[in-house]
Amino acid sequence: MASILLRSCRGRGPARLPPPRSAAPRGPAGDLACLSGASAVGLMSYVPLPLGSCAPVRPVYLSLRADPLGCWTLRPKRACAVLAGPRLLPVRCWHSSRPLGDDSVVEKSLRSLKDKNKKLEEGGPVYSPPAQAAVRKPLGQRVLDELRHYYHGFRLLWIDTKIAARMLWRILHGHSLTRRERRQFLRICADLFRLVPFLFFVVVPFMEFLLPVAVKLFPNMLPSTFETQSSKEERLKKELRVKLELAKFLQDTIEEMALKNKAAKGSATKDFSVFFQKIRETGERPSNEEIMRFSKLFEDELTLDNLTRPQLVALCKLLELQSIGTNNFLRFQLTMRLRSIKADDKLIAEEGVDSLNVKELQAACRARGMRALGVTEDRLRGQLKQWLELHLHQEIPTSLLILSRAMYLPETLSPADQLKSTLQTLPEIVAKEAQVKVAEVEGEQVDNKAKLEATLQEEAAIQQEHREKELQRKSQAAVAQAAKEVEPEVVAEGAPGRPVAELQPEEPAVTLPSEVLKDSAPVLEGLKEEEITQEEIDVLSNACSKLKEQKKSLTKEKEELELLKGDVQDYSQDLQEIKKELSKTGEEMYVEESKASKRLTKRVQQMIGQMDSLLAQLEADQKAGRLGPAAEAAPAGETVISVSELINAMKQIKHIPESKLLSLASALDDNKDGKVDIDDLVKVIELVDKEDVHISTSQVAEIVATLEKEEKVEEKEKAKEKAEKEAAEVQN
């Protein structure tokens, strides 16, 4: 089961775009995508076209005091050769840790408890009271409900087992999983441990025992092999890598498992069902508190993964992103833009809206889909402050806020009414998953029927993605085959029976000078050179692996192990804070951690101790010279390499044009000091490799800037939390 971690979530189908055209004819009225009952957004007619390039769009300034982020445009199509020759396989990304800002179920439960206690202290309502008291059901009805619960539970167990077995079989045979598939697999594992608690004693103890056997039987399941002088070093590094990824996956599974609240009566799930019924069916307006409360459940990843294509196109047009391409490409550029906006919001809140000048205010409002031209400075500051209030204080997801702007609702509507209209446009699958999420956050018993429906809908979406990729692959193969067949036919059309030397070239038609039209636009020769294909991402991964091996660097493993220890510590601290918050209302005795979660936590702690021993053994052997020559680099800069070293390593693996290598190296060297950190480079590769898109070197620079911005925000938040804890300890 944990072998999922031994393969990257990489997509192989490149996202291509149609060639640039003149003004496309607008479609009929049916081509308008109506996002609400009262407003519509006019979209271009979507027609399947051969995939190529698109016209560039103007950049949008997101960072307030940094370089502008350019547009996300794809480059012309180019033939990709198969990478062959080197024995060193690519270093694939693992994607087992949670993305920045992706909170676990326990963290969401803690935040929900803090909000409730804060509202109780302020005297406000925690949630809308029920219209009437619950009536105790008859005994026969309760028995039937219990039987239905177990019936759907067994169905869910059977379907989860089938899906998990199919995904595991694909991984063992060298196939990769998409981001959606991996998220589905993680949820299924958490469900299996929840439905069958004793499964821990059957599966987990044999994971570490069987993984070395699986590595021997299925070598393709490993993301990379190590080209070393010592087989012992290779074995130890593989063992360390396997244990590290397995422990990270188990920790993610622990954080996905919800707490048990014995005092919960299912009120939160019922409240959500009533709320969604009001906005979808009855037309009754829910309270502002209900809208704000349940809007938090529709997270960015959940919303973007389930939006329809017209909605994705509308969001891209609103944010001035490329609106033509595959759904994966549209989601990727929207995800990157939302991540950049999140980091910018926190930086703006720290600096203060009043510290921004007019140009910065216009850039910030424009990047968030709000009016930026033709409005007063006070209006700009007001709408930006409202955005920060909703996003940072009310914790409304960014995707919902931008989607509400894409609907062009009247500006006189309140934020609650805008969110209500936005929620009405979301697909049904989003509501199903949100219903399951609210039960997990509140610690209530998860409805097996709702969980089953959400799992089946997610599986249907995964199968649809597979069909689209297969159709795209067949279409590209057919186009390539047709191009090969056309070339000999054109040559053979010369004049049959006559030698080629006798063929006289046709005289060109005489054209009057007044009729000659000259194109004064510059020819974009370097456009094709800037594209980074999936093959070149593999070459870059190879270069990183080779350079790290030359330096005998274990910094990445050390960093990931420290992050894992931090996740385990944060999880235990969250549990303690939950008990502290519950003690204010006298309910701490009713909420507890599940047995499977406790057992998995003990196993993860044991594996952390084993990995510490492995790291110590590897470092001792390297210093003693038993694993080859010791590294000469200083520990402080062992992962920092020069740009020339990176270029030379890529040249040794695969021939790439010099101009592209220089452009790529310049994009990775953000501070232009001629040095690149290998670990930072690996992070960029992991982010790009798991998406099914092609990017340019300029977009690589934007990704580097976004990651650095997020790291800066994360460091500030950690420093702030540390200062608050120290202040609390001093007061106590």
Curated annotation (Swiss-Prot):
InterPro entries: EF-hand-dom_pair, EF_Hand_1_Ca_BS, EF_hand_dom, LETM1-like_RBD, LETM1/MDM38-like. Plays an important role in maintenance of mitochondrial morphology and in mediating either calcium or potassium/proton antiport. Mediates proton-dependent calcium efflux from mitochondrion. Also functions as an electroneutral mitochondrial proton/potassium exchanger. Crucial for the maintenance of mitochondrial tubular networks and for the assembly of the supercomplexes of the respiratory chain. Required for the maintenance of the tubular shape and cristae organization. Residues 1-93 form a transit peptide. The modification Phosphothreonine is found at T178. The lineage of its organism: Eukaryota, Metazoa, Chordata, Craniata, Vertebrata. Residues 238-529 form the Letm1 RBD domain. One of its GO terms (molecular function) is calcium:proton antiporter activity. This is Mitochondrial proton/calcium exchanger protein. It is a single-pass membrane protein. Residues 448-478, 528-620, 701-732 form a coiled coil. Keywords: Antiport, Calcium, Calcium transport, Coiled coil, Ion transport, Membrane, Metal-binding, Mitochondrion, Mitochondrion inner membrane, Phosphoprotein, Potassium, Potassium transport, Transit peptide, Transmembrane, Transmembrane helix, Transport. Residues 656-691 form the EF-hand domain. Disulfide bonds: none annotated. Residues 216-732 are mitochondrial matrix. It comes from Bos taurus (Bovine). PINK1-mediated phosphorylation at Thr-178, positively regulates its mitochondrial calcium transport activity. Ca(2+) binds at D669, N671, D673, K675, D680. Belongs to the LETM1 family.
